Amino acid sequence: MATYKKRGFKPKDKDEEKRLEEQESTTAEVFSSLDQGASRTEEWVSTNQNYILGFIGVIAVGLLGYLAYDQFVQKPKDIGAANELYYPQQYFDLALNATTEKDSLFNLALNGAEGKYGFLDIIEEYPGTKAANLANYAAGMAYLSMQKYQEAITHLGNFSSDDEMLGAMAKGGLGDAFMQLGQPSDALGYYENAFEFSNNQYTTPRFLYKAGVTALELKQNAKALQYFQRIKDDFATADEARTIDAFIGMAKSGK
């Protein structure tokens, strides 16, 4: 720290004078070191400014490259994929509402026809797009309906969404697939994921019910009772609540 003399200050004796001279010398050395450090920094920047500017340039080019990719590659890719989704979606909707030939319609939705892409083509040709993500959901549900459970697990497992309905339905679909494959423990985990995913009047009581029934099968009666009781308490108007008292009785009796 610098030492300053007051105006008119005189040292009391020689020892005091010597001490002041030493302080002034130390202060001068500190400022000299700071000046040398600043000079070395300026010298380094001057010597390496091409490197520094080049490094900044690399960052700028990378950022511009990302923005250009998003604007000129990813966005057009998303638009193209979304346009392709229209054709298989029509067959998927028809299959859901059909009473006969469901599998034929689902196959058209999956594989396409008349030169048009199906869901599987969109997944392969437009990876990373929102349309490909939705195509995974639709393909998984189609395979589930066609009783091709491993394929259903693959595609539903590749789907991700924050949507409270689609996200829950995908988790529940995985539960259904594992249940059909004779893996109730795995199924229960996905049913629990499904009703925990969001809280609404449709998917929550549906998967609480499936989780409860599966828990009964696994002899986890306390857990089953908890799920059935929640339906009774929180979703009294849901379809699943109509016979819930009987299931509550089964869970309590241990049957």
Residues of each region from the PLM?
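Structured, soluble extracytoplasmic/luminal domains of envelope-associated proteins
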Residues: 4, 120-176
